[in-house]
């Protein structure tokens, strides 16, 4: 594949989502995948929880983002501390990011029904370039590409998670340290990512509409230095404690989107979710939309643990 093809892809991405790769990947089902952005969530489900997610963004556009996540977290025996480990693989055009991080949380009771968790995370980010690009004759001899590819960078994060059985509020910064992957090369700086600190503000509430129906609105605000603000809002209905159905809307200067969510509790231990998202920005002319699949598995549930959990 010619270098010009990769550069064309990069120009398109940056024209519709300025500095998109500077940020952690975004999710439509963020309300069911909180551990990926907030370490204070570790152990909050009061059981060993395993969550896997696959996201194919902007399907039909060559080089569109693809993301996979896998996280495992659990409370310890004293139930005040939680531990977790999370892995994220994110591919955007010719760039690949892999995140491997450990999570720790400590929870205190602020009232009879409310808990506040403090969280920290630490780990490594791996940055690499697509092998097809590196093997292209037009770039093989360019030391710039060889220097920036296959880099490991340490990072740390922190978060707060305040919650009861009916509502939650979260504040987190999963990557605090800034990382520049350009190594001082000015010529192609616009086509190589920076990893910059992002702040996440989350919240949600569960309303009882009837004996069999509940409504859970939720929101996520993401602020990244050098990138547009992103605001996600969603509303999900829960029917018979089994089926979630809802919609989502993302407000973003370059990557606005609307979507639908369906999530089914197969058993007390397993649930599966699907989300479809369609952009309402300039990128819509090049894609049929975004698909996202989530699978959650929980083990060692005791009878005292409420199922299903609302967040």
Where in the sequence are the language-model features?
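Cleavable N-terminal signal peptides
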Residues: 8-9, 19
């Amino acid at each position: 594949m010619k270098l010009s093809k990769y550069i064309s892809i990069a120009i398109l991405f940056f024209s519709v989502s300025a500095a998109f790769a500077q940020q952690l990947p975004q999710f439509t089902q963020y309300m069911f995948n909180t551990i990926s952005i907030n370490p204070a969530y570790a152990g909050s489900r009061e059981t060993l929880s395993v969550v896997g997610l696959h996201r194919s963004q902007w399907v039909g556009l060559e080089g569109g983002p693809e993301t996979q996540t896998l996280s495992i977290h659990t409370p310890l025996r004293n139930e005040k501390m939680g531990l977790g480990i999370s892995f994220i693989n994110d591919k955007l055009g010719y760039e690949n990011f892999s995140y491997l991080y450990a999570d720790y949380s400590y929870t205190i009771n602020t009232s009879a029904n409310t808990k506040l968790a403090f969280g920290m995370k630490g780990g490594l980010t791996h940055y690499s370039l697509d092998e097809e690009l590196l093997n292209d004759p037009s770039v093989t001899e360019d030391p710039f590409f060889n220097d920036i590819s296959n880099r490991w960078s340490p990072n740390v994060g922190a978060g707060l998670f305040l919650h009861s059985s009916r509502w939650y509020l979260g504040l987190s910064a999963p990557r605090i340290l800034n990382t520049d992957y350009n190594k001082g090369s000015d010529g192609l700086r616009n086509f190589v990512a920076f990893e910059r600190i992002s702040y996440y503000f989350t919240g949600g509430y569960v309303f009882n509409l009837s004996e069999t129906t509940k409504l859970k609105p939720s929101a996520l605000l993401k602020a990244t230095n050098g990138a547009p603000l992103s605001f996600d809002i969603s509303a999900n209905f829960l029917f018979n404690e089994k089926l979630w159905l809802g919609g989502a809307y993302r407000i973003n200067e370059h990557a606005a989107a609307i979507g639908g969510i369906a999530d089914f509790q197969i058993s007390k231990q397993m649930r599966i979710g699907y989300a479809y998202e369609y952009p309402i920005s300039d990128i819509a002319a090049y894609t049929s939309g975004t698909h996202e699949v989530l699978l959650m598995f929980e083990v060692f549930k005791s009878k005292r643990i409420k199922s299903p959990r609302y967040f």
